[in-house]
Swiss-Prot record:
An example Gene Ontology biological process: phenylalanyl-tRNA aminoacylation
Keywords, comma-separated and alphabetical: Aminoacyl-tRNA synthetase, ATP-binding, Cytoplasm, Ligase, Magnesium, Metal-binding, Nucleotide-binding, Protein biosynthesis
The protein's assembly and partners: Tetramer of two alpha and two beta subunits.
Subcellular location(s) of the protein: Cytoplasm
Cofactor: Mg(2+)
EC numbers: 6.1.1.20
Organismal lineage: Bacteria, Bacillati, Cyanobacteriota, Cyanophyceae, Synechococcales
Organism: Prochlorococcus marinus (strain MIT 9313)
The protein's name in its UniProt record: Phenylalanine--tRNA ligase alpha subunit
Molecular-function GO terms, alphabetical: ATP binding; magnesium ion binding; phenylalanine-tRNA ligase activity; tRNA binding
Length: 335
């Protein structure tokens, strides 16, 4: 640039810069090209800055004219850059969407449908049946104390169930519950009779694993406490439940013994030509009621317990309890 410059020369440079900017911006194909143009036109070392730098050689009264024209051009270029950027971004998005178009007519690979585990559905069916009879669901901890698991249920200290060969002891006074009956005691401590509850849950016993036994399995306990309950109410409840669950299978009651019920009975159903035990039940022993501060002369009740695995195996014709725990999808997908 010469040592002297005129107002007309700078004005001509700004006009030429405007024309070049308009043409270059319109031809820019992507955001990177627009950014390069912005730097070359409006950057600190850009062409507009060069023109403004030469403005100092003009007489003071002419400088505002050049400055005003340069500001207008700068605003114009910024607007053109912004508008063109939106255009190229929209074009890039449209091109990407075109390339990524999904063919909705193409055959789908299919997503396998999940299945609820048969133990879960069996438990829910049992609980639903008793809920329909007016029973409320109750739950309790799986880690229990000796008191709730044994003593409060009238199980004496010399009873075989207390032996370490049958129970998982955790140290101190704690153990893994061997049945869900402790839920009944805990519930009665907090809720005065009359009560009707059904208590599903996981239980633990030191059983060897075979086709019919597992150290971890599931039980459902039923308890009813009210005035005037007798064995006929127990029998009627059990019969109604078994008919609803199994249909018209033959059922029989056999006299038995449980420390916390008296009289006690085991319940069998006829399955595959033989009698199969499915439940234990009985009238709540007066000693259990007295331990809870209830007058056995006023209150009576019955309790029943069943193994969910046994009910599930009978319902679905499963011959080995271990099948329920293998997580073999070929087996589980049948349900």
């Amino acid at each position: 640039m010469s040592a002297t410059i005129s107002l007309q020369q700078l004005t001509d440079q700004l006009d030429a810069l405007e024309a070049e900017a308009v043409s270059a911006i319109a031809a820019a194909a992507d955001a990177d090209a627009l950014e390069q143009l912005r730097v070359s036109l409006l950057g600190k070392k850009g062409r507009l800055s060069g023109v403004l730098g030469a403005m100092g050689k003009l007489p003071s009264e002419e400088r505002p004219l050049v400055g005003q024209r340069a500001n207008v051009l700068k605003t114009q270029v910024q607007n053109l850059l912004g508008e063109r950027l939106q255009v190229v971004k929209a074009a890039a998005l449209a091109d990407r969407l075109l390339q990524e178009t999904i063919d909705v007519t193409a055959p789908a690979s299919g997503i396998p449908v999940g299945h609820r585990h048969p133990l879960i559905t069996t438990t829910e069916q049992i609980v639903d049946l008793f809920s329909g009879l007016g029973y409320r669901v109750a739950e309790g901890p799986e880690v229990e104390t000796d008191h709730y698991n044994f003593s409060a249920l009238n199980i004496p200290e010399d009873h075989p169930a207390r032996d370490m060969q049958d129970t998982f002891y955790l140290g101190g006074n704690l153990l893994l519950r061997t049945h869900t009956s402790p839920v009944q005691i805990r519930y009665l401590e907090e809720n005065p009779p009359p009560v009707r509850i059904v208590a599903p849950g996981r239980v633990y016993r030191r059983d060897a694993v075979d086709a019919t036994h597992s150290p971890v399995f599931h039980q459902v306990e039923v308890l009813a406490i009210d005035e005037g309950l007798d064995f006929s109410h127990l029998r009627g409840t059990v019969m109604a439940f078994l008919k609803a669950f199994f249909g018209d299978m033959p059922v029989r009651f056999r006299a038995s013994y449980f420390p916390f019920t008296e009289p006690s009975a085991e319940v069998d159903v006829q399955w595959r030509g033989r009698w199969l035990e499915v439940m234990g039940c009985g009238m709540v022993d007066p000693a259990v009621l007295e331990g809870l501060g209830l007058d056995p002369e006023r209150w009576s009740g019955f309790a029943a317990g069943l193994g969910v695995e046994r009910f599930c195996m009978v319902r679905h014709g499963i011959d080995d309890i271990r099948r329920l725990y293998t997580s073999d999808l070929r087996f589980l997908e049948q349900f």
